[in-house]
Amino acid sequence: MADGGRAVMDRDQMISLVERHLKAEGAGDVEGAVAVYTDDVEHDVVGWPTGPLRGKDAAREFYRHLTANFRTEDERPQHRYFAGDAMVLDQMMTGTVTGSMLGMPGNGRQITFRVLHVFEFADGLISRENVWLDGGAIQQQLA
């Protein structure tokens, strides 16, 4: 036990939970993507117009927008780092922009870009997700 008596998840549990989240997101399964979140989750895609979001309902709206505009086709982890109840995932993502992304029309183009996620966990669920996208690579491929 750590952090005031809360059980710390092990690495395999963290990886499994994040993979469930990403698989659901990639399949366009909004409910599955948020099912692994705590009710008071903080979801922050740095630079996204909405700013940080709080709670499952707000995250659900984000994923509805994302899955309506982007279809994930491949995710390749580059590195994973662990510290206490946190995991950093550095990955390459490939998908098709079916609508728009970062305010730019996708016109059905396939793009590949780097993504850095910082996940925090509480009570066996994801309590925080911060995401940094390689906006320059996205814009260059959509221009």
Name the predicted role of every residue range.
Residues 2-143:
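C-terminal and inter-domain tail/linker signature
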